[in-house]
Amino acid sequence: MRKLNPYFGEFGGQYVPEILIPALDQLEQAFIDAQNDPSFQQEFQDLLKNYAGRPTALTLCRNLTQGTRTRLYLKREDLLHGGAHKTNQVLGQALLAKRMGKTEIIAETGAGQHGVATALACALLNMKCRIYMGAKDVERQSPNVFRMRLMGAEVIPVHSGSSTLKDACNEALRDWSGCYERAHYLLGTAAGPHPYPTIVREFQRMIGDEAKAQILAREGRLPDAVIACIGGGSNAIGLFASFIPETSVQLIGVEPAGKGIETGEHGAPLKHGKLGIYFGMKSPIMQTEEGQIEESYSISAGLDFPSVGPQHAHLNSIGRADYVSVTDDEAIEAFKTLSRREGIIPALESSHALAYALKLIAQNPDKEQLLIVNLSGRGDKDIFTVNDILAARGEI
């Protein structure tokens, strides 16, 4: 009998081949046991503090908001070991895998940040590591590929389909179905078959828990809005989870509009997709008129995903969270602006959330507002991509 609800409203579920059901049931039970085991929690918290570097800072952007009445804070997941929020839940899942007696880890990665986090956790915990990555992403994220291999991971380029994240996910699941007795599939986002969306949220929720305590200590009140980018949605649900009960706080998720929603080259299934079943879950998906999975597109590899986590779909359906989109060009402008005005180079993924915050500020410069943006990762991995774009424009 299930202990955790596999659905968020009508979204979620467990649509996988029958062969994987025992592995998912084992994972669910291990997670429940671990959540109630003080020694597991102590080990996890110790790794987060003394290995990963939590809590992360909440940084006030004084320069960006000059001349306005906005106070804009960044939740600095870019300062976490590994360079992004991914490290949080990877450490949790890797400890779970050890607890279940697994010796191998299988993972997928888009921007490479989840791959790096998985590689470092496997090195630390002495586990074999296989990471599937779309061939296109291997090209555009070469620094992260090198980091993964340096830490002992086997990186497997995927050439099928669009050679991006969705194809890497498919290959990782296929691999796992043949070796789940010895391997754990370390899924990188709050999506996929139950119980992954719940596990990933719970192993990321310290982002929002910390941000809430930090903003209350600094400002004496809750923020008016918290803003995060959305690919699969793990950094956003990690930030949102603590604020969902606080109805005065607006939750804003920012999907990638890519080259513009009207061009069809985007990654915004929540607002522009149709309900379907993909990657083991029921959630909005980018689909063709024939019902096939449509290729998503974003300049940021970590947002280039044709579906979205089921809890975001639920929050959208009940109106608790607002989902908007930002184009490649707007994200690049935000990337440049934060780098030049605050000396912080953000990931292109995080730049989408920042771009929307800057829009809000520009629209209401005289409005007193308190905002938190989740700076989900650092931009080292994106400097070559942005350099090429700016060089082509003659801007550098």
Swiss-Prot record:
One of its GO terms (molecular function) is tryptophan synthase activity. GO terms for cellular component: cytoplasm. It holds the Pfam family PALP. Keywords: Amino-acid biosynthesis, Aromatic amino acid biosynthesis, Lyase, Pyridoxal phosphate, Tryptophan biosynthesis. SUPFAM superfamilies: Tryptophan synthase beta subunit-like PLP-dependent enzymes. It comes from the Bacteria. Pathway: Amino-acid biosynthesis; L-tryptophan biosynthesis; L-tryptophan from chorismate: step 5/5. InterPro entries: Trp_synth_b_CS, Trp_synth_beta, Trp_synth_beta/beta-like, TrpB-like_PALP, TrpB-like_PALP_sf. Its EC number is 4.2.1.20. Belongs to the TrpB family. NCBIfam families: trpB (TIGR00263). The beta subunit is responsible for the synthesis of L-tryptophan from indole and L-serine. This is Tryptophan synthase beta chain. It comes from Proteus mirabilis (strain HI4320).
